[in-house]
Amino acid sequence: MTSQARIPLWIVAVVAGLGVITVVGLFFYGSYVGLGSSL
C-alpha cells in the first residue's frame, strides 16, 4: 500500500456504511408506511 492512495480506505468504508444504512432505512421505512396505509 502506497502512502499516496488516491482514495483512503476509511472514506470508502464510511461511504459504503452510509449507503447500506440508507438502503436498509428506506426499506424499513417503506415497509412501515406500506403496513400503516394497508391497515
UniProtKB/Swiss-Prot annotation:
UniProt cross-references to Pfam families, sorted A to Z: PsbJ
Intracellular or extracellular location(s): Cellular thylakoid membrane
InterPro entries named among the record's database cross-references: PSII_PsbJ (IPR002682), PSII_PsbJ_sf (IPR037267)
One GO-annotated biological process of the protein: photosynthesis
Keywords, ordered alphabetically: Membrane, Photosynthesis, Photosystem II, Reaction center, Thylakoid, Transmembrane, Transmembrane helix
Assigned GO CC terms: photosystem II reaction center; plasma membrane-derived thylakoid membrane
Protein topology in the membrane: Single-pass membrane protein
Transmembrane segment boundaries: 7-27
Function of the protein: One of the components of the core complex of photosystem II (PSII). PSII is a light-driven water:plastoquinone oxidoreductase that uses light energy to abstract electrons from H(2)O, generating O(2) and a proton gradient subsequently used for ATP formation. It consists of a core antenna complex that captures photons, and an electron transfer chain that converts photonic excitation into a charge separation.
Assembly: PSII is composed of 1 copy each of membrane proteins PsbA, PsbB, PsbC, PsbD, PsbE, PsbF, PsbH, PsbI, PsbJ, PsbK, PsbL, PsbM, PsbT, PsbX, PsbY, PsbZ, Psb30/Ycf12, peripheral proteins PsbO, CyanoQ (PsbQ), PsbU, PsbV and a large number of cofactors. It forms dimeric complexes.
Family indicated by similarity: Belongs to the PsbJ family.
Matching HAMAP family: PSII_PsbJ
Name this protein carries in UniProt: Photosystem II reaction center protein J
